[in-house]
Structures are given as structure tokens and as C-alpha cells.
Amino acid sequence: PPLNIALPRTANQHGAACLNYMPVTAIERTGGWIQSLTATDKETGESCRIRTRMIFNCTGVWTDSIRRMVDPDAPSIVRCSRGSHILLDRSFLPGDSGMLIPKTRDGRVLFCIPWHGMTIVGTTDVEQREPDWNPQATEEEISFLLETAAGYLAKPVSRADVKASFAGLRPLLRAPEGGSTAKASREHAVIPEFGNMITVAGGK
């Protein structure tokens, strides 16, 4: 099964109580220690208070949102980078092999891969200011992918050939010097903070 299903399933087998669709909505901290958090059931609207001894903040692009429930002035440590992909007909990449374009005009790599009877083309690297539960590929990104892949595909391609598009968000570590997300570190950091919270941030 996919990792996001296998992980809670394995945790449950080891005695964890896995609460899906129950986002944290508040965190209580007194005396330099996180005492509890409040989670709300998205299906019923009911909230519950959970007492805590230790919190692991492994929330990807929502890392800073959780940290600011503890301290509204906590500095940002994560940048959101959007990666978008398009799906084309299989005829644009006949055969069973994928293809890697080593350098695009923005200095990234681009890939074309056979995928479930289609051809997947990706990816972009665009900074997104705020996390989004349902990120979308922009027309600018779709045009970039088409223009970059056009010289390598088996036949001419146009916007009308795009069967679908999708996007995801990367939680990249924020560097003091800034710069483009394409050049941002793909490393991760493990940060003990707020007395009894461990934040795992970054990675890809």
C-alpha cells in the first residue's frame, strides 16, 4: 500500500490510536511545557482535548502552522515549493523506457515516464506562499512543461493534448539567504523545541 496508508496501519498494529481527518486546532502550553492539544473531527465537528507528554510535529508544509499554535511569533522554518505534472497520451512516449531531460531553462531536470497507460511529464518548482490542501498546476506551469518536453516527444504536442494535471507541495527548509526553491536544500532537520515538541522539517 502507499506509504501514507502503510505508516498509520503499522502504527496501529503496534498499539497507536490513529485519528484520521482530525486536524489539530489548538495547542495549550503552560510553564514552558505543552500540556495538551485540541483536535476536531471533520466528519462530526466534535472536538476533543488530548493531554500530551511529547509531540512530534511531522506535518510537512503545515510545520509552521503547528509551531505557531504554540508560539505565534515562531519564525518560519519551511518554504512551500509546488511541483506540477501533466498527463499525455501514451503515444507521445512509445516504448517502455522513461526519459530525463537534464537541464531546463530554469536549471531543473524534467522527466517523461510511462505511467498507467499514459505519459507523465514533470516537474516544476514554484514557490507557493501558503500551504494548500489541493494545490493546482497553473497554466504557466503547464505551458512550461509542454514547451520543454516538445523537443523530445515522438510527435508535436499542444495544450489540447493534456489529459490531466496535478500538483504537490514540497516542505523545504528555509535558508537565511533566500533564493529560488529550485536551489533550496532538500535536507531535513530534527528540532527539539517548546519543551516537549520535536519538529521534523524539510526533506523531499
Regions found by a protein language model. Give the residues of each.
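Short hydrophobic core segments
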Residues: 50-60, 149
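General beta-strand structural signal in soluble alpha/beta enzymes
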Residues: 18-20, 57, 121, 199-200
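Glycine-centered loop/turn positions within well-structured domains
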Residues: 25, 35, 64, 84, ...
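Flavin (primarily FAD) binding-site architecture
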Residues: 57-72
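C-terminal catalytic lobe of FAD-dependent flavoproteins
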Residues: 2, 6, 10, 68-204
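Glycine-rich nucleotide phosphate-binding loop and flanking beta-alpha elements
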Residues: 45, 62-63, 94, 127
